[in-house]
Amino acid sequence: MKMETLKQQILTAKGDVRAELVLKNARVINVFTNEIEQADVAICQGIILGVGHYTGETELDLQGKYVCPGLVDGHIHIESSMLCGPAFEQAVLPHGTTAVVTDPHEISNVAGTAGLDFMLETTKDLALSVYFMLPSCVPATGLDESGAVLEAEQLRPYYQQPRVLGLAELMNSYGTVRADEKILQKIRDCTAAGKKIDGHAPFLSGEELNAYVTAGVQSDHECSDVREAMEKLRRGQYIMVREGTAAQNMDSLLPLFREPYCSRCMLVTDDKHPGDLLQGGHIDYIIRKAIAAGVDPVVAVRMGTLVPCQYFGLAHSGAVAPGYTADLIVLSDLEKFTVEQVYKKGKLVAQQGKMLHPAALAVDKARFARVFDSFNMDEITPEQLQLKQTGTRQRVICLTPHSLLTTEKIVPFCQHPGTAPGVDVTQQIVKLAVFERHHRSGHVGLGFLGNYGLQCGAVASSIAHDSHNLIVAGTNDADMVLAGNTVRKNKGGLAFALNGQVVGELPLPVAGLMSTESAEAVEEKLQALKAALKAHGISEDIDAFMTLAFVSLPVIPKLRLNTYGIVDVDAQRIVPAVF
């Protein structure tokens, strides 16, 4: 900073020089002292210079409305919104989110460093601050088949990027606590760069948790009960309280929303569908829900602002105070947390739920050919769906409502006319398949899914964490083939086939994960698909696509299905579907 600039800022902060903008007669939410102050907020050149009594070149009388720091999502995968950067910004910025920390491991699993470069490029000029954690597990484990492999040497150059804050969720806790040298090299590189390491270790406890934290892992977003969260807090980790579309843990973790725990806990969404962003909101939704549950509003705000900024080392961010960046939101109602205006570096960027100057997606498709042409597989044939195992019993991967966890159920092998072998819609058991789509290997994993609810037809998705192969669930092989091939033809996306007809589809041509359209356009097609699926049995407690997308992730207990077959996550081995 130049000497003259610093002098001018000091004079303005003293009140000797008028500020560029003053938000007058505000109720300022103070996240340092957990109180609300009656004051003006003085802003110059994107920086807050004073909280007190000020005059300005421009003055806006807030008439007692609340001024709050801009909201920060400390852990999200933008790709899970199915939106590219500009469309994602349009969905979250009007809700008061001024910064996100994203882990682009979805697109990196498909396209490697080309995917990471795409995300950096398409978010660099947004009003929304988009920070990155480098994907640590591509693929998630050795028991997976991704489109790319990212080792330490591929990640190392990215630590020089100013928007890269560290190493993202270390999902392979099994390998970490067993001192796998490939994982340890990534940890060493991140630590040498002075950056953060996020965790992902559901149920890790005792000595293994000690080992995980010793390795350098500083946070966790997978806690589903307060006992687990408390143990991790005691061992020095930050807790990311997750409230997303598929995984919703806030209610279970409400005891953390008070001192002394709240100073080490932040709010995150992890994965959020476009409709939930547009209609319910983003971090503002979690704060509203917390307040409605009896949480002190200022505590909830602190967990969605100051705490993530302190954790990630985002200096001079996350508070309404002198010297802090003027990323602010104006609330007309604190209890309802109604966002009226959003300021980014002192400039009004959104008002009454709309961005004032939305950005457009501008990208060189030739440069990112690997991102826009990510399907490398042959057409699906009925023969690929034939079970090669025989036996009298079958193993079912059972979904848990509002959770990413699954359970195991063993039932007698089902045989019913009109459905595929192993399917029993009366018991909510459907057939499940995962087709490798990156290397034309022809690998197909087959299994059975419980509690999904589908009564007829088939659902296909190229969003299938984390390797994003093609996952298909259905009651009969013919519709499974049709739904899967529809997604393949579209170079990615979602599809529902019924009685030999495609009932609905949503193309996602960006790595098979994201659309180039607006949030509203994506949501309209997605809602049409979901309505059709609910009409054919999908439970109200299940998000038809996001829940299905996690069935293939072999790092969250108990059972998953990928291109190798059914994975017992705890044992890290393949187990038979029929035996």
Residue ranges, per PLM feature:
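Divalent metal-coordination and catalytic microenvironments
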Residues: 26, 46, 64, 75, ...
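Short acidic, glycine/serine/threonine-rich loops at helix termini
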Residues: 111-115, 141-147, 178-182, 208-212, ...
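Divalent-metal coordination cores built from histidine and acidic residues
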Residues: 2-12, 89-194, 260, 503-507
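Active-site beta-loop-alpha junctions enriched in small/polar residues
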Residues: 77-79, 105-107, 135-140, 170-173, ...
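Histidine/acidic residue-rich metal-binding segments in metalloenzymes
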Residues: 149-169, 175-240, 247-268, 278-292, ...
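Active-site microenvironment of metallo-dependent hydrolases
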Residues: 1-39, 43-44, 52, 93-95, ...
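Active-site mouth loops of central-metabolism enzymes
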Residues: 73-84, 139-151, 218
